[in-house]
C-alpha cells in the first residue's frame, strides 16, 4: 500500500515508480491511494496501473465529483472501474452512480464498521465476510490473472 498525505507533502514520482517496480518484480499487488489532484507522482502511478479504481460514496455530491474526474482519469489510463460505498442517504443506487459516471461498477458495499478505529489502533483485520473484504475480492478478480512470480509461479501487478 502506497499513500500520500493531504498536508502539502508531495510524493516524488521517482519514488512511486521505484515502489511499483519493486512490487511487480517481487510478485505482489501494489495498491496506491492517490490524491484527487494530479501530480507527477499521481501520473506515474496511473500510468503504471493495470486497473484504476475510483471509490465513491453513494450520494449526489460524490456522484458529481466522480463524473467530473472519470474522463480525466480515462485519458491517462482507460482501465477504470468504480466501487460505490453506501448506503445512500437519498435512495441513490450504486448502479445509478456507475451509469451517471460512465464507469463499470466493480463492486458496491456498505460502510465497513469501525474502519477508522481499526486503522488507528493496530491495523486492519478483516473477516472474510466483511463488506470491505468482499468488495476487495471482487476488485482483485478483475485484475489479469497472475503469470509467473519469482519462486512461486505468479507475477506482480499494480492496482
Tell where the protein language model's regions lie, with residue ranges.
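A general structural detector for well-ordered alpha-helical segments in enzyme core domains, enriched
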Residues: 16-19, 69, 93
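P-loop/Walker-type NTP enzyme "switch/lid" segment
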Residues: 1-28, 115-121, 125-127
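An amphipathic, basic-hydrophobic helix/alpha-beta surface used to engage anionic
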Residues: 66
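Short, small-residue-enriched loops and turns at beta-alpha junctions
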Residues: 7-11, 38, 60-63
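C-terminal lobe/tail of nucleotide-utilizing enzymes
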Residues: 75-159
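Inter-motif core of Ras-like GTPase G domains
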Residues: 27, 36-60
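Conserved catalytic network of the ASCE P-loop NTPase/AAA+ motor domain
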Residues: 22-25, 46-47, 74-75
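Conserved beta-strand segments of the P-loop GTPase G domain that flank and frequently precede/overlap
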Residues: 3-4, 31-33, 53-58, 81-86
Amino acid at each position: 500500500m502506497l499513500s500520500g498525505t493531504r498536508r502539502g507533502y508531495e510524493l516524488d514520482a521517482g519514488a512511486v515508480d521505484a515502489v511499483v517496480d519493486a512490487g511487480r518484480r517481487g510478485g505482489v499487488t501494489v495498491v496506491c491511494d492517490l490524491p484527487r489532484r494530479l501530480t507527477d507522482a499521481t501520473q506515474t502511478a496511473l500510468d503504471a496501473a493495470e486497473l484504476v479504481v475510483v471509490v465513491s460514496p453513494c450520494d449526489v455530491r460524490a456522484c458529481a465529483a466522480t463524473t467530473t474526474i472519470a474522463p480525466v482519469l480515462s485519458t491517462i489510463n482507460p482501465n477504470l472501474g468504480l466501487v460505490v460505498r453506501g448506503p445512500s442517504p437519498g435512495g441513490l443506487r450504486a448502479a445509478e452512480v456507475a451509469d451517471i459516471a460512465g464507469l463499470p461498477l466493480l463492486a458496491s458495499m456498505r460502510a465497513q464498521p469501525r474502519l477508522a478505529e481499526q486503522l488507528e489502533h493496530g491495523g486492519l483485520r478483516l473477516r472474510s465476510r466483511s463488506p470491505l473484504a468482499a468488495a476487495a475480492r471482487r476488485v482483485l478478480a478483475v485484475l489479469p490473472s497472475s503469470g509467473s512470480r519469482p519462486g512461486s509461479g505468479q507475477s506482480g501487478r499494480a492496482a
